[in-house]
Amino acid sequence: GLYHQKYDYPPETILSHTFWEERPEEFYRFYRDKLIVKGAKPNAAHLRLAKLEREGRLKAVITQNIDGLHQAAGSKTVYELHGSTLRNYCVKCGAFYDVDFIANSTGVPRCPGCGGIIKPDVVLYEEGLDEQVLSGAVSAIRRADTLIIGGTSLVVYPAAGLIRYFRGDHLVVINMQPTNADAEADLCIAKPIGQVLSEDVVVEE
């Protein structure tokens, strides 16, 4: 498809730790082209979730997205399972660089301070999830009385396995396609999550 027209490898190969180490030029070309989303703005779903948090009705957002749009919408407690393109660090000295630094760099981005390679704070294939983020997400799910799963078919692990920690009363699934959680859910809505959350849904306490 689209990837093979421009790149010699499938995205799963390019976005692996091994590829980042062995072919960094190619990795960063793909990364700038496909993973950095310029000018993206929070949608109605992002804004609604942030509003629910401000109202004290939502405790946390757990996301597989790496675009930082939940925070841009105003959400405070966000567990980014796969990291974020907005954070980048020098592998040598640990200096922080924003997404614009990577977007505007050419070739392999290097730290002006020490010359080390700047690596995105994104979980690549072959890398484990951040333990603190994972334990925070598990803790939030364990404490929740309602869990809303939206916009994911629950096939990517370990994220898909987090549902097993839920002990609450109400499991809601909002997804266009069937998911592995549908059988256990109290409510399944086969619509795009952006559409559902932008509608005026009344939630009884």
What is the predicted role of each segment?
Residues 1-205:
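Conserved catalytic core of sirtuin-type NAD+-dependent deacylases
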